[in-house]
């Protein structure tokens, strides 16, 4: 199989990279009616597979799970989760031939094997859905021409997909139709109905392309979503301990601080996150972020270049073929870092303290979000896609670190995200180590010694304007506004 993106000419590549629009609520007035009465079979019963299935069943759809015969015979976790929740479970051979819609919610690395296994079993004119387009775009999977190929990708972990649905809402969702596989021209209608059944239309749906989703998703997860957070944790912990901060306190300040700081980011963007700092701390965080961007910009550009060219996918798939030798070694090395093995602390840390003593963390998040967003847009990815794959998802990943540090993050994210995270981290740590070592203890762990909030007014105005007047802040305010409006509409219905 050849890389699908690289098989297109430049005009086709740019057209698909730039495909993304926020869909109007009126486009979902028929809900999931288009696929009611269909036999819908889910492959995979992990967090996304189970929780999407629960939502779709509650929306009135007919859901069953196809598992490998050995998983059923041995009553593995996937079988237990599906049966405990009252779903019909069968083998591929039993369920796939009757399926109108097959949802491939297995891990990325398994997609080629899974699709090649189920495709001969699928009936004429059936539909195959992905939640991530890597198999189509990077591996170049060619699906039978009579099969419609769509993508429905909730931009949140599976557990949140379920919890938001139970609250009467949903999570932002990206949908797409593979242009090579839309034989009846109804792929978009199927994707819309599927997204509605999971609750996605209540939070906002982006109509995108397989290519835009893959290239932006890979870039976001490698850089700001995982790589920058891991780099911040490893270097930040080293710095604080070297400065004499008690190890348990240092680990907690980072582990819980990343989540607390990014919650402010989630609610009101970079502007709100920076506004949580005192005036002197805000100016310092702004200056640090600019310095960090200067150091890291070439690394962000290299990751984007390797993602666009397919070089990243080529090297990762070579590691797949080598039984994940690099991935497993890097995972083990990460688990041996000082931050991962730091003692826990029961010391209470006030919410504001995470900002006051975490100026460096704020600067890293600001620099990472802006670099990831701007680098994606410069590569031809539309702003809406770039926002959802940078700022929007950062708090979700920080939440995993808050639970069980970097181990939890790397367990929850996809195999492609974990591999890319390690690549970025291995380059970023040496780039930033001297910078972090040389910075004042006031910026991480200590807090500013001067309690005065006094600053030069002209400089503060300049900094505030620079923070607010960026493309990621403009599009973020617009998209968060859409989500709030839709939540109000959902609550009123």
Swiss-Prot record:
It comes from the Bacteria. Keywords: Amino-acid biosynthesis, Branched-chain amino acid biosynthesis, Magnesium, Metal-binding, NADP, Oxidoreductase, Repeat. It is an enzyme of class 1 (oxidoreductase). GO terms for cellular component: cytosol. Residues 209-344, 345-486 form the KARI C-terminal knotted domain. Its cofactor is Mg(2+). Pathway: Amino-acid biosynthesis; L-isoleucine biosynthesis; L-isoleucine from 2-oxobutanoate: step 2/4; Amino-acid biosynthesis; L-valine biosynthesis; L-valine from pyruvate: step 2/4. Involved in the biosynthesis of branched-chain amino acids (BCAA). Catalyzes an alkyl-migration followed by a ketol-acid reduction of (S)-2-acetolactate (S2AL) to yield (R)-2,3-dihydroxy-isovalerate. In the isomerase reaction, S2AL is rearranged via a Mg-dependent methyl migration to produce 3-hydroxy-3-methyl-2-ketobutyrate (HMKB). In the reductase reaction, this 2-ketoacid undergoes a metal-dependent reduction by NADPH to yield (R)-2,3-dihydroxy-isovalerate. Belongs to the ketol-acid reductoisomerase family. This is Ketol-acid reductoisomerase (NADP(+)). The gene is ilvC.
């Amino acid at each position: 199989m050849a890389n699908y993106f690289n098989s297109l000419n430049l005009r086709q590549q740019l057209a698909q990279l730039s495909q993304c629009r926020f869909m109007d609520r009126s486009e979902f007035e028929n809900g999931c009616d288009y696929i009611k009465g269909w036999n819908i079979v889910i492959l995979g019963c992990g967090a996304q597979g189970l929780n999407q299935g629960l939502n779709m069943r509650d929306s009135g759809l007919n859901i069953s799970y196809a598992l490998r015969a050995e998983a059923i015979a041995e009553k593995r976790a996937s079988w237990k989760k599906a049966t405990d929740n009252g779903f019909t479970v069968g083998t591929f051979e039993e369920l796939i031939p009757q399926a109108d819609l097959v949802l491939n919610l297995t891990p990325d690395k398994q997609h080629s094997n899974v699709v090649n296994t189920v495709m001969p079993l699928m009936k004429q004119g059936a539909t195959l859905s992905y939640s991530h387009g890597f198999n189509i775009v990077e591996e170049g999977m060619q699906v039978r021409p009579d099969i419609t190929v769509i993508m429905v990708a909730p931009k949140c972990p599976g557990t949140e997909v379920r919890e938001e649905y139970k609250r009467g809402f949903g999570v932002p969702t990206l949908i797409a139709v593979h242009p090579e596989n839309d034989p009846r021209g109804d792929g978009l209608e199927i994707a819309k109905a599927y997204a509605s059944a999971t609750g996605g239309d209540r939070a906002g749906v982006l109509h995108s392309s397989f290519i835009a989703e893959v290239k932006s998703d890979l870039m976001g997860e490698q850089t700001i979503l995982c790589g920058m957070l891991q780099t911040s944790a490893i270097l930040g912990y080293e710095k604080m301990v070297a400065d004499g901060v008690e190890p348990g306190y240092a680990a907690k300040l980072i582990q819980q601080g990343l989540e607390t700081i990014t919650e402010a980011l989630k609610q009101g963007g970079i502007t709100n996150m920076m506004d949580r700092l005192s005036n002197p701390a805000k100016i310092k965080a702004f200056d640090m972020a600019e310095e960090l961007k200067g150091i890291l910009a070439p690394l962000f550009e290299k990751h984007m270049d390797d993602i666009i060219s397919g070089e990243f996918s080529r090297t990762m798939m070579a590691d797949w073929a080598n039984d994940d030798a690099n991935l497993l070694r890097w995972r083990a090395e990460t688990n041996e870092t000082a931050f991962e093995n730091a003692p826990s602390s029961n010391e209470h840390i006030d919410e504001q303290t995470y900002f006051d003593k975490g100026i460096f963390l704020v600067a890293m998040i600001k620099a990472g979000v802006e670099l990831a967003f701007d680098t994606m847009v410069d590569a031809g990815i539309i702003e809406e896609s770039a926002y959802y794959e940078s700022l929007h998802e950062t708090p979700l990943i920080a939440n995993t670190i808050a639970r069980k540090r970097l181990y939890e993050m790397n367990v929850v994210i996809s195999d492609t995200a974990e591999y890319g995270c390690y690549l970025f981290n291995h380059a970023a740590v040496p780039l930033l180590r001297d910078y972090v070592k040389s910075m004042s203890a006031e910026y991480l762990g200590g807090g500013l010694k001067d309690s005065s909030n006094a600053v030069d007014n002209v400089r503060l105005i300049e900094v505030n304007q620079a923070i607010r007047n960026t493309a990621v802040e403009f599009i973020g305010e617009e998209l968060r506004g859409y989500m709030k409006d839709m939540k109000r509409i959902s609550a009123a219905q």
